[in-house]
């Protein structure tokens, strides 16, 4: 979509409608389903707004850590294999801030408010 409203704005409006007027008009088990639908619309909205940048950042961070290029999935598979081997403590320490940054980016999309963890004092 090129003009306004954007897809993200439409999803926000759908979520607002579901969580406002629709939720107030229903009762019983359907209320839970309406809440879930509203939450899903908000997740997709945030994915549209933040997902591309988060994926680019993940690919760059993991690629830099590994000194490799590839798709995000390929780089993550290589990272998992290196960590699973558990034979390089220095690599594991270097991976920690990368994994935390990637996780916080994903939380910003999936569960905002849980993405504010301060891991500056964390030690591996």
Regions found by a protein language model. Give the residues of each.
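Short, charged early-sequence alpha-helical segments and their helix-coil boundaries
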Residues: 47-63
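N-terminal interaction modules that seed assembly of large macromolecular complexes
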Residues: 16-48
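C-terminal amphipathic alpha-helical interaction region
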Residues: 4, 8-16, 24, 28-30, ...
